[in-house]
UniProtKB/Swiss-Prot annotation:
It is an enzyme of class 2 (transferase). It is a multi-pass membrane protein. This is Diguanylate cyclase DgcN. It catalyses: 2 GTP = 3',3'-c-di-GMP + 2 diphosphate. The keyword Nucleotidyltransferase does not apply. Residues 183-236 form the HAMP domain. Residues 1-24, 74-112, 176-408 are cytoplasmic. Bifunctional protein that catalyzes the synthesis of cyclic-di-GMP (c-di-GMP) in response to reductive stress and then dynamically relocates to the division site to arrest cell division in response to envelope stress. In the presence of high intracellular c-di-GMP levels, and in response to envelope stress, interacts with cell division proteins and halts cell division, without disassembling the Z ring, but by blocking its further progress toward cytokinesis. Part of a network that regulates cell motility by altering levels of c-di-GMP. GO terms for cellular component: cell division site; plasma membrane. Keywords: Cell inner membrane, Cell membrane, GTP-binding, Magnesium, Membrane, Metal-binding, Nucleotide-binding, Stress response, Transferase, Transmembrane, Transmembrane helix. The lineage of its organism: Bacteria, Pseudomonadati, Pseudomonadota, Gammaproteobacteria, Enterobacterales. Homodimer. Interacts with the cell division proteins FtsZ and ZipA. Its cofactor is Mg(2+). The gene is dgcN.
C-alpha cells in the first residue's frame, strides 16, 4: 500500500499534465507563428526597401541630369552629398555614358558596424541600385546607390521586438484562457476520483458523482452512479443477511431469546469488566415438570410452554436484566445493578411467583410449571467457569429441596 501511495505521489496530476500539454502546444504554435510572421515581415521589408531606394534613385536622376549633361562633377558631388546627408543611402556614384565616374559620395561610419547589420545590408541589397539618367529620351549616364544599413537594421530590430512582445502577450492570454477553460475538466475529474476513492477506501456506497456539463463525463457519472446503486443495494442485502446470520447464531430460533453462544460471550465480557462484576449476579433456571408436559400433551405443546417461559423471562428482565435459553428447559438470566445478595433472593422469589401462574396450552387445558432457580454473585468469583459451577450447583440443590417437599 505504501509503494502504491509513493508511486501515486511521483506521478503528475491530471491538472499538471493538462497544463504541460497546453504550455507545449502554445509554445510550439506561437514559435511557428513568430517565425512565419518574422520571415514574412522581413521579406516584405526587403521589397519595400528596394523599391524605396529605387524611387530615391529615380528622383535623383532629375537633379543630376544637368550636371551630367555639362559633365559638372563638383555640382553632381554637391547634389549627392546633400541627399546623402539625409541618411537614405551609404554610397552613391554618378557615371557618364562611357561608365566614367563623374561624381561619388561615401557615408563615413563612426563605428565599423555589427555583423548583423552588415548581413542585413548585404541580404537586402546584394548589388547597388542602378538608375539611368536620361536627357531628351537618350541615356546619358546612370546613378548607383547602396542603402544605408543602420536605419534598416534598426527598423528590423524594432519590428522583431514588437512582434515578439505581441507573441508573448498573446501567449500569456492564451495560457490564462486555457487554464480557465481547463478548470471545468479538472474539477469534473477531481469530483469523480474523490467519489471513487471514498467508495474504495471507506466503503461509502452512498456517495454519488454529480452531473457534469461535458457529455462523456456526464455519461460516465450516470453509469458509475448506476453501478453504485447496485453496489449499495448489494451491500445492504449483505448487511441484512449478516445481521440475520448473526441473530441466528446468537439467538434461539424457538423462543427468540439469546442462546448459549451469546450467553458465553456475555458472561465472559461481564467477568472481564471489574466495575460491572461488583453489581451483577447469575441465575440458572430449570423446569421441574417439563418432561411431564411433553409426555402428556406432546412436543408441540411443550414448545408453546417454552415460548411462554421465554416471554415471561423477557418481560420480567426488561431492559435491566438479560435472559438466555441454554437448551431444552434450561434458562439463564444475568442480573445487573444488584447491590446485595438479599436483593438477588428477592428477585428469585419474584420470578417464582411469576411462574406459579398457570400456562394456557391452547388445547382447552391449563397447567402449572415451576422453575428451580440457583444463583451466584459475580463479585465472589474470578472466572466465568467458577461462577457457572456455583449457580448450577445451587439450582440443583433448589430442585432437590423442591422434590423432597413434594415427597413429604
Amino acid at each position: 500500500m505504501m509503494d502504491n501511495d509513493n508511486s501515486l505521489n511521483k506521478r503528475p496530476t491530471f491538472k499538471r499534465a493538462l497544463r504541460n500539454i497546453s504550455m507545449t502546444s502554445i509554445f510550439i504554435t506561437m514559435m511557428l507563428i513568430w517565425l512565419l510572421l518574422s520571415v514574412t515581415s522581413v521579406l516584405t521589408l526587403k521589397q519595400y526597401a528596394q523599391k524605396n531606394l529605387a524611387l530615391t534613385a529615380a528622383t535623383m536622376t532629375y537633379s543630376l541630369e544637368a550636371a551630367v549633361v555639362f559633365a559638372d562633377g563638383p555640382a553632381a558631388t554637391e547634389t549627392l552629398a546633400a541627399l546623402g546627408q539625409q541618411g537614405q543611402f551609404s554610397t552613391a556614384e554618378v557615371r557618364d555614358k562611357q561608365q566614367n565616374i563623374l561624381a561619388s559620395w561615401h557615408y563615413t561610419r563612426k563605428d565599423p558596424g555589427d555583423t548583423f547589420s552588415n548581413f542585413i545590408s548585404h541580404w537586402l541589397f546584394p548589388a547597388p541600385i542602378i538608375q539611368p539618367i536620361r536627357h531628351n529620351g537618350e541615356t546619358i549616364g546612370e546613378v548607383r546607390l547602396t542603402a544605408r544599413d543602420s536605419s534598416i537594421s534598426h527598423f528590423i530590430w524594432f519590428s522583431l521586438a514588437v512582434l515578439t512582445g505581441c507573441i508573448l502577450l498573446a501567449s500569456g492570454i492564451a495560457i490564462t484562457l486555457t487554464r480557465h477553460l481547463h478548470n471545468g475538466l479538472v474539477e469534473a475529474l477531481k469530483n469523480i476520483t474523490d467519489v471513487v476513492h471514498d467508495v474504495r477506501s471507506n466503503r461509502n456506497f452512498s456517495r454519488r458523482v454529480s452531473e457534469e456539463r461535458i457529455a462523456e463525463f456526464h455519461r460516465f457519472a450516470l453509469d458509475f452512479n448506476s453501478l453504485l446503486d447496485e453496489m449499495e443495494e448489494w451491500q445492504l442485502r449483505l448487511q441484512a443477511k449478516n445481521a440475520q446470520l448473526l441473530r441466528t447464531a446468537l439467538h434461539d430460533p424457538l423462543t427468540g431469546l439469546a442462546n448459549r453462544a451469546a450467553f458465553r460471550s456475555g458472561i465472559n465480557t461481564l467477568m472481564n469488566n471489574s466495575d460491572a462484576r461488583k453489581t451483577s449476579a447469575l441465575l440458572f433456571l430449570d423446569g421441574d415438570n417439563f418432561k411431564y408436559i411433553n409426555d402428556t400433551w406432546g412436543h408441540a405443546t411443550g414448545d408453546r410452554v417454552l415460548i411462554e417461559i421465554a416471554k415471561r423471562l423477557a418481560e420480567f428482565g426488561g431492559l435491566r436484566h438479560k435472559a438466555y435459553r441454554l437448551g431444552g428447559d434450561e434458562f439463564a438470566m444475568v442480573l445487573y445493578d444488584v447491590q446485595s445478595e438479599s436483593e438477588v433472593q428477592q428477585i428469585c422469589s419474584a420470578l417464582t411467583q411469576i411462574f406459579n401462574l398457570p400456562f394456557d396450552l391452547h388445547n382447552g387445558h391449563q397447567t402449572t410449571m415451576t422453575l428451580s432457580i440457583g444463583y451466584a454473585m459475580t463479585i465472589e468469583h474470578a472466572s466465568a467457569e467458577k461462577l457457572q459451577e456455583l449457580a448450577d450447583h445451587n439450582m440443583y440443590q433448589a430442585k432437590h429441596q423442591r422434590a423432597e417437599k413434594l415427597v413429604r
